[in-house]
Amino acid sequence: MSFSSLPTEIQSLLFLTFLTIYLVTLMGNCLIILVTLADPMLHSPMYFFLRNLSFLEIGFNLVIVPKMLGTLLAQDTTISFLGCATQMYFFFFFGVAECFLLATMAYDRYVAICSPLHYPVIMNQRTRAKLAAASWFPGFPVATVQTTWLFSFPFCGTNKVNHFFCDSPPVLRLVCADTALFEIYAIVGTILVVMIPCLLILCSYTHIAAAILKIPSAKGKNKAFSTCSSHLLVVSLFYISLSLTYFRPKSNNSPEGKKLLSLSYTVMTPMLNPIIYSLRNNEVKNALSRTVSKALALRNCIP
C-alpha cells in the first residue's frame, strides 16, 4: 500500500493528522445524526436527508481510514485479497450512493423553494423514504458488478497496490489479462454515475436560481439562498475533487497527485460536511444549543 516509502517521522505525523480528522469526522457526523433525531424542529425532509448523508459519510470513512491508520501505525502495508475486494466494494457503494443522495437533496431544496406551500405534501414521509432508498440502491449493482468483474481476472507479477486504498485503477494495473472491455465499462459507468446526478443537481439549482431571482425583497432572497448554500458548497467540494481525480488526462494524472486528490473526497469532505452544515445553518446551530442546554439541565438534575 501507499505510505511505505515515506520516512518514519512523516508517517507518524500523518497518523496523528488522519486520526484527528477521523475522530472529528465521526463526532461531527454522529452529532448531526443525534441532533436531527432529538430536536423536533429538525424533523423535516431536509434534515432527514442530511441525516442520511451523515450515515453515508461515516460509512465512507470507516471503509478507508481505519486500514490507513493501521498501515501507518503498525507499518503493516499488506491487505488480503478478500480485504481488498471488500474495501473496493464498499468504496464504490458509498461513493455512488453519495452522488445520488446529493442529487436527492438538491431536489428537496428545489421543492422547498419553488413550491413552498406544497412542500409538506410533496415531501411526505413515504416520498422521502422512497427517495432515500432510490439514492442508496444504485450503489449495490454498481459495486457488485465492478468489484466482481475486476477480481475475476487473473493477477500476476507484482502485488503492490500503489495507493492508500483499493481503488479500481491501481488494482487494474496488476491484472495480467485483456481488460479492454472492463475499462470501457468502467469509464462509461463512472461518467453515468457522476454525470446523471450532476445534471439533476444542475437542473434543480437552475430552477432554484430562477425562483430566487423572482423574489422581490432582498431579505427573502437571502433567506432562500441560505437554505441551499450549505448543500451547494458540499456538492462543489465533492464533485470538483471527484472530477479532478477521475476525469483528468492521463498525462496530467500522476499516481502521487491522484493520491492527494483522493484524500480530498475520501477523508477531508466527510469531515467538512458536518462543519459546513453546522456553521452555515442557523437551525442546526440553534438545535445544537438547545440539545447542549437540555443535556446540561439533565445533568444538573441528577444527584
From Swiss-Prot:
Localization of this protein: Cell membrane
Superkingdom of origin: Eukaryota
InterPro entries listed in its UniProt record: GPCR_Rhodpsn, GPCR_Rhodpsn_7TM, Olfact_rcpt
UniProt xrefs under Pfam families: 7tm_4
Segments on the Cytoplasmic face: 34-41, 108-126, 205-224, 280-301
Cystine pairings recorded for this chain: 84-176
Main location group: membrane
GO cellular component terms listed in the entry, alphabetical order: plasma membrane
Gene3D superfamilies linked: Rhodopsin 7-helix transmembrane proteins
GO biological-process terms attached to the record: detection of chemical stimulus involved in sensory perception of smell
Annotated transmembrane regions: 13-33, 42-62, 87-107, 127-147, 185-204, 225-245, 259-279
Keyword terms: Cell membrane, Disulfide bond, G-protein coupled receptor, Membrane, Olfaction, Receptor, Sensory transduction, Transducer, Transmembrane, Transmembrane helix
Topological domains annotated Extracellular: 1-12, 63-86, 148-184, 246-258
Function according to Swiss-Prot or TrEMBL: Odorant receptor.
Similarity-based family: Belongs to the G-protein coupled receptor 1 family.
Record protein name field: Olfactory receptor 10A2
Annotated organism of origin: Homo sapiens
Lineage, uppermost ranks: Eukaryota, Metazoa, Chordata, Craniata, Vertebrata
